[in-house]
Amino acid sequence: MNLNTASGGTVTVSEVAFGKDFNEPLVHQVVTAFLAGARQGSKAQKNRSDVSGGGRKPWRQKGTGRARAGTIRSPIWRGGGKTFAAVPRDHSQKVNRKMYRGALQCIMSELVRQERLVVVDEFTVDSPKTKAVAAKLKGMELTSVLIVTDNVDENLFMASRNLPKVDVRDSQGVDPVSLIAFEKVLITVPALKKLEEALA
């Protein structure tokens, strides 16, 4: 299949990578797993055995008129432990390579169908100035955009990192979440070829 470039030319790409039917359950599962894997998972609380103190019975069992108590660190006491204390855990979910590649194929194909994929010959700036990238994107009428290049140029990275709703990745750094998070995906021809090679 052929894709039109912003300069008026065309580039031939694989039907497998850019002409796949959209599989919503697959994309949902892969995106959910990706976000789950990004969770820190380090939350920790103390249960009644973790809280310091409370080794002695606060008062005798009978004869005081008060409710019986065995420890001052009971979860119903102020300063006591948490009933179901959170422990550090791994939130990651298993996604095999075939599923991950299939989800990326679905997303790229949907971007093509919705005309959200903008192909350019190259995208570079001469200096790390934000206004240089801002002017280029304004000229192309792009506000929310993921820029995918063959190799991330330091000038381009520095110039774009202060712009809201703009991110720069190389072809190996794209992921399902970044591809769907922006209104448009601006990709250079060399990056497109590398991505096609990885997805085909």
Swiss-Prot record:
Gene3D superfamilies: 3.40.1370.10. GO terms for molecular function: rRNA binding; structural constituent of ribosome. Keywords: Ribonucleoprotein, Ribosomal protein, RNA-binding, rRNA-binding. GO terms for biological process: translation. Residues 42-69 are annotated as: Disordered. One of its GO terms (cellular component) is ribosome. PANTHER family: 50S RIBOSOMAL PROTEIN L4, LARGE RIBOSOMAL SUBUNIT PROTEIN UL4M. Belongs to the universal ribosomal protein uL4 family. One of the primary rRNA binding proteins, this protein initially binds near the 5'-end of the 23S rRNA. It is important during the early stages of 50S assembly. It makes multiple contacts with different domains of the 23S rRNA in the assembled 50S subunit and ribosome. Forms part of the polypeptide exit tunnel. Part of the 50S ribosomal subunit. This is Large ribosomal subunit protein uL4. The gene is rplD.
